Swiss-Prot record:
Predominant localisation class: cytoplasm
Residues engaged in binding substrate: 154-156, 200, 213-214, 236
Subcellular location: Cytoplasm
Site, as annotated: Activates thiol group during catalysis: 182
Functional summary from the UniProt entry: Catalyzes the NAD-dependent conversion of D-erythrose 4-phosphate to 4-phosphoerythronate.
Annotated SUPFAM superfamilies: Glyceraldehyde-3-phosphate dehydrogenase-like, C-terminal domain, NAD(P)-binding Rossmann-fold domains
Protein known as: D-erythrose-4-phosphate dehydrogenase
Keyword Cytoplasm: yes
Residues annotated as catalytic: 155
Amino acid sequence: MTVRVAINGFGRIGRNVVRALYESGRRAEITVVAINELADAAGMAHLLKYDTSHGRFAWEVRQERDQLFVGDDAIRVLHEHSLQSLPWRELGVDVVLDCTGVYGSREHGEAHIAAGAKKVLFSHPGSNDLDATVVYGVNQDQLRAEHRIVSNASCTTNCIIPVIKLLDDAYGIESGTVTTIHSAMHDQQVIDAYHPDLRRTRAASQSIIPVDTKLAAGITRFFPQFNDRFEAIAVRVPTINVTAIDLSVTVKKPVKANEVNLLLQKAAQGAFHGIVDYTELPLVSVDFNHDPHSAIVDGTQTRVSGAHLIKTLVWCDNEWGFANRMLDTTLAMATVAFR
């Protein structure tokens, strides 16, 4: 069957989901029937076609009245403020991809369900009372038909959780720290301007800016045994896409750097193929732009100190990789629900 999808919020992730759907050749499995976005349809069409990070979209894009066309495919455009007013029942929507970055509670999910959607997938971490939080490649097999309201976690969680799992399974993690080196985001300023977070009052292109992160909580959601044993900090840097994560863990078993690299390389070629990649090329952040993997391990940066402290550097395209995982999780939800 073809999963009928509606997208709520057509920002960075919403637009990349549409692009990834067409570029990955999965249109026989997923069709986008509607997009709800408060911005005007002409702007939606323009930003789908032309993207500073990802270039021109290969498909023809045009807008006619309340429809957006990608090639010959017509997508209904909505501008509803209220979730309760969305016509998901009328449109036969199977899964809503809520990409607003604003909604994430069970109440918000239930509003989509009340409007007629069968399932809801949030493109960001949700509240603890959601039916499931998925990092595709790690725990999607735990999805059940009764799971209606699901979170796809965050781009950084999708990046680091597979690597943590691999290291923990192999060597037994005792504790860890994570530093996220994240590209600038829309909640930062072009030039100095007011913001509740005083660090984010400063021009994004001129500084490395520390910001709050809930990544440690995201890690312990998947690995409760690490409660109070993982900490995370984050900085934003003056690039517009791609993120690096510096992961340091202490482990129970003694290990060498080449053994860590061999473990991660084999995983990239085997059980985590398509989710984790591995490289020893002398690459920089822009080289990972438009990479569909959740995580790319940079083997040249792996270090081991005292046989028990492992440091790794993991890259991800925080937009493109995550958009591809949204599609993967959508299909996983549909597979268990509609078979």
